[in-house]
Amino acid sequence: MTYEVKSLNEECGVFGIWGHPDAAKLTYFGLHSLQHRGQEGAGILANDQGTLRRHRDTGLLSEVFRNPLNLEKLTGSSAIGHVRYATAGEASVDNIQPFLFRFQDTQFGLAHNGNLTNAQSLKSELEKNGAIFSSTSDSEILAHLIRRSHNPSFMGKIKEALNTVKGGFAYLMLFEDKLIAALDPNGFRPLSIGKMANGALVVSSETCAFEVIGAEWIRDVHPGELVIFDENGITYDRYTDDTQLAICSMEYIYFARPDSNIQGVNVHTARKRMGAQLAREFKNQADIVVGVPNSSLSAAMGFAEESGLPNEMGLIKNQYVQRTFIQPTQELREQGVRMKLSAVSGVVKGKRVVMIDDSIVRGTTSRRIVKLLKEAGAIEVHVAIASPALAYPCFYGIDIQSREELIAANHTVEETCEIIGANSLTYLSIDGLIDSIGIDTDAPNGGLCVAYFDGKYPTPLYDYEERYLESLNEQTSFY
């Protein structure tokens, strides 16, 4: 078992709507609000009185639908859409969602955000039994399980399939007569339900998509829940009662847009609280606070308010460069860092700078930014990270492939500080992170998955277990 199976992983965004005459166009607008979750490909599938039509391609949403006819042909009152992040070698149209399947006398579409931890085993077993896969994505597995279930009822087949797949998943399934949303038993990925003024129902990876189409948030989908949208409205069902909230803490730290709310917590507010707590844990002297745009700006505000230091715009971002964390190869990441940021000499020259960032993954970005600030005249650069040290992989749907790619898994804080060229390095504590996010729940770790920081995974790792345990004894130098 190698980490190659991790190439099935994707951090994506899904959006669906039921009961609106312009369903596909509204899905386009909803996906536009989710573009930050993936820029490798996009697609929309619409249902027009039982006829399902789809358009998908690689690239940004605006590129995929550059020809307006591609959107106009997607008529109907319900639709689902997907924006995709792909790991290296996967950026082909075959892997772009939504997928479209035929089953008995019907069709259905499927869009998925997450990663299945038993995908390799399931796929091998399905292929032995004659299943033919048209993509390399783990998302296709659910459809084959539904097809091959012997449960007499169709909803029973879906529930059986959902209980068979393991890991992190937020699924949208569009049928001729219904739209179904399903969330994994730990709620690793966010998924929210909204309603429009005309009664149309919407479901989205993030609530920021509701604002752009004028929808009002109803509630989040619960772990282990199956939500059915049809001519009768909304039906809330469950496929399992063995649930425990463990939503991905990286949604609050990095992935989600600041104007989204997840589990009742506004992302911007959570990040500000992370920054304030980081200031309380910071032990060095400085003159100004500089946040790394854009996902660290909220934390920088909180740090500045708590510390009493001025929050300055010492770094300027080129808004037309993709985010480095979710670009698919190391070469592209390094090029991206060079292109996307500039230091403001007039702000940082002669100053002791606290550089606030949301995370350190490989160290490429931090090293380059510290160098930029010092070249611009900063006399000291103290790096303060508004999350704990990322020392363990994610197996539930984030592009953290292995421990060998994580600088904190291979070096002490002091060594990492030396490698990135900073004068000091401070990480937010795990308890500080949990308290700052502050989900109202009795679940362990405040309802968060913090396995990336402490290595304590809330579920079995299945196909990844053997290789992961081997990796704990391996070291990679970042010097």
At which residue positions do the language-model features occur?
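Conserved short alpha-helical segments that host acidic/polar catalytic motifs at enzyme active sites
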Residues: 1-223, 228-286, 292, 380
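Short, well-ordered loop/turn and helix-capping segments at boundaries between secondary-structure elements
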Residues: 20, 128, 148-151, 309, ...
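Flexible loop/turn segments at secondary-structure boundaries
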Residues: 22-24, 87-88, 118, 188-189, ...
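Generic beta-strand/beta-sheet core signal
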Residues: 111, 174, 182-183, 194, ...
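Secondary-structure transition/capping motifs at alpha-helix termini
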Residues: 131, 151-152, 283-287, 305-312, ...
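Phosphate/diphosphate-binding loops
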Residues: 160, 208-209, 216-217, 224-225, ...
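PRPP-dependent phosphoribosyltransferase catalytic core
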Residues: 162, 177-178, 214-220, 314, ...
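Short, glycine/charge-rich flexible loops or terminal/linker lids adjacent to PRPP-binding catalytic cores
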Residues: 308-353, 364, 391-397, 401
